[in-house]
């Protein structure tokens, strides 16, 4: 069996979305497991919507996920170029060959004529199919025309899909579709076939929204006289409402999840499990995925995208990182929020306490910004815990911390425990007013960690402000 040559062929009309990323991942894993080749091709024939910004975003997204390509933009390869707009002569040559052999023909029908036929079909409540008006007309390259592929009148085209099994499409459900526009730009099916032939792709793995294209493409392979590749159509990714995943379900681009503070290994881990499994194992390194992944284990049932489960997976991966690693990862997120964080012991301590609480690096910033910015006092917490009744506790803790030569853990703990014992109350009666004073809210890491992270000067400053508030008339 030949080593697999697979491809990922995105259209640069937007960011790398979740569905596309999973398609790339499945192809990449299959190539890596079998010593094959992963080709990246950019299908940029939609000139109005394709942008260099989108190309860059797709490449950046793949690199961030760790999906390197063996041939394609930036790395070259034996079958250049890797942008469809640079391959127009190739499509023209293949189309003209099909015309010469009677397997395609020039269609001279005007847009107005075709629109009139469509309207008539609508009025008669039937589906419009091109009637083959120009099938037998002589080829006149001097006349404006498109090129149509000649579909056999009878029979059916079948293939054994690696994921979906045997699929058959009757030819009478197909029409003579346009394969080359008048400006020389190929339509999707023809461009993909010519590219896959010339790039020697022998396995086409893609989303199952392309199933309906497959019979048409197989007919084109056969007409051109080339071997038909193996096809694998991966199940759709749906939102919680079982509709196709879209922006209304929340973030759908890889870039968005990177910016929210997801780790690439977590995104890869979650995406691969949307359609593939290996026993009960939930978490996989990329090396493990290369070792275990098999297309025969990809299910045919659509996967439901669950942001909460994805966040859980990310949290598990964050917990595997050391505070030192987390600090380097979290620093750009703190700085992007305008917070004066540094890669220092303070940030490492913040990450150590955040690791068990926050599921994304973005949540590190959201939940613990009070370590780097003035607190935003929760009105309910302020009304309940910064009062004349709690002022003595706040004062006692403030004075005890001021007297400490250093904020060693045991000494800080003793401040809180000692005050609770002196007052004959539970630890919460002491800690909670101080927590509100130092963080602005009623939920935080342990007060010993909070005091140590803030440092003595900032802790005393915030306690002094809390004492001022607690002394105000209610």
UniProtKB/Swiss-Prot annotation:
GO terms for biological process: glutamyl-tRNA aminoacylation. The keyword Protein biosynthesis applies. GO terms for cellular component: cytosol. A motif ('KMSKS' region) lies at residues 244-248. Its cofactor is Zn(2+). SUPFAM superfamilies: An anticodon-binding domain of class I aminoacyl-tRNA synthetases, Nucleotidylyl transferase. Binds 1 zinc ion per subunit. Its EC number is 6.1.1.17. InterPro entries: aa-tRNA-synth_I_cd-bd, aa-tRNA-synth_I_codon-bd_sub2, aa-tRNA-synth_I_CS, aa_tRNA-synth_I_cd-bd_sf, Glu-tRNA-ligase_bac/mito, Glu-tRNA-synth_I_codon-bd_sub1, Glu/Gln-tRNA-synth, Glu/Gln-tRNA-synth_Ib_cat-dom. It is an enzyme of class 6 (ligase). Its main location: cytoplasm. It is found in: Cytoplasm. It catalyses: tRNA(Glu) + L-glutamate + ATP = L-glutamyl-tRNA(Glu) + AMP + diphosphate. CDD domains: GluRS_core (cd00808). Pfam families: Anticodon_2, tRNA-synt_1c. Keywords: Aminoacyl-tRNA synthetase, ATP-binding, Cytoplasm, Ligase, Metal-binding, Nucleotide-binding, Protein biosynthesis, Zinc. PROSITE patterns: AA_TRNA_LIGASE_I. ATP binds at residue 247. It comes from the Bacteria. Zn(2+) binds at residues 107, 109, 134, 136. A motif ('HIGH' region) lies at residues 10-20. Belongs to the class-I aminoacyl-tRNA synthetase family. Glutamate--tRNA ligase type 1 subfamily. Monomer. Catalyzes the attachment of glutamate to tRNA(Glu) in a two-step reaction: glutamate is first activated by ATP to form Glu-AMP and then transferred to the acceptor end of tRNA(Glu). This is Glutamate--tRNA ligase. It comes from Anaeromyxobacter sp. (strain K).
């Amino acid at each position: 069996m030949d080593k697999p040559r697979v491809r990922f062929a995105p259209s640069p009309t937007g960011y790398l979305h979740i569905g596309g990323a999973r398609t790339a991942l499945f192809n990449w894993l299959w190539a890596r497991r079998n010593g094959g080749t992963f080709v990246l091709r950019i299908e940029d024939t939609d000139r109005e919507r394709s942008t260099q910004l989108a190309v860059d975003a797709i490449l950046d997204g793949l690199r961030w996920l760790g999906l390197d390509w063996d041939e394609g933009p930036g790395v070259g390869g034996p079958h250049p170029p890797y942008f469809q707009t640079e391959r127009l002569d190739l499509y023209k040559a293949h189309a003209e060959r099909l015309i010469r052999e009677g397997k395609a023909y020039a269609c001279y029908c005007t847009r107005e004529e075709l629109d009139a036929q469509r309207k008539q079909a609508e009025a008669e409540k039937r589906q419009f199919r091109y009637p083959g008006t120009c099938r037998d007309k002589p080829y006149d390259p001097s006349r404006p025309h498109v090129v149509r592929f000649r579909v056999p009148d009878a029979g059916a085209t079948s293939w054994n899909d690696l994921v979906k099994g045997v699929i058959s499409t009757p030819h009478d459900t197909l029409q003579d579709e346009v394969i080359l526009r008048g400006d020389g730009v190929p339509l999707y099916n023809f461009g993909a076939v010519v590219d896959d032939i010339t790039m020697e792709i022998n396995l086409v793995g893609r989303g199952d929204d392309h199933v309906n294209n497959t019979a048409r493409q197989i007919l084109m392979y056969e007409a051109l006289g080339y071997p038909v590749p193996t096809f694998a159509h991966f199940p759709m990714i749906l939102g919680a409402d079982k509709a196709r995943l879209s922006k209304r379900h929340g973030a759908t681009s890889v870039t968005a999840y990177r910016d929210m503070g997801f780790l690439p290994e977590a995104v890869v881990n979650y995406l691969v499990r949307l359609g593939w499994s290996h026993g009960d194992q939930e978490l996989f390194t990329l090396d493990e995925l290369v070792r275990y992944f098999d297309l025969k284990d990809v299910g045919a049932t659509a996967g439901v995208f669950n942001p909460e489960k994805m966040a859980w997976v990310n949290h598990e991966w964050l917990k595997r990182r050391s505070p030192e690693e987390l600090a380097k990862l979290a620093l750009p997120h703190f700085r992007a929020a305008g917070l004066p964080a540094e890669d220092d012991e303070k940030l490492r301590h913040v990450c150590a306490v955040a690791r068990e609480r926050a599921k994304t690096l973005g949540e590190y910033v959201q939940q613990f910004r009070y370590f780097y910015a003035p607190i935003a006092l929760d009105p309910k917490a302020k009304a309940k815990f910064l009062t004349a009744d709690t002022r003595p506790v706040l004062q006692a803790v403030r004075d005890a911390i001021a007297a400490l030569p250093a904020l060693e853990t045991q000494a800080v703990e003793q401040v809180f425990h000692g005050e609770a014992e002196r007052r004959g109350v539970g630890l919460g009666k002491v800690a909670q007013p101080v927590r509100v004073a130092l963080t602005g809210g009623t939920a935080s890491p342990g007060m010993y960690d909070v005091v140590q992270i803030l440092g003595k000067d900032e802790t005393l400053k915030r306690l002094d402000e809390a004492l001022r508030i607690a002394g105000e008339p209610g």
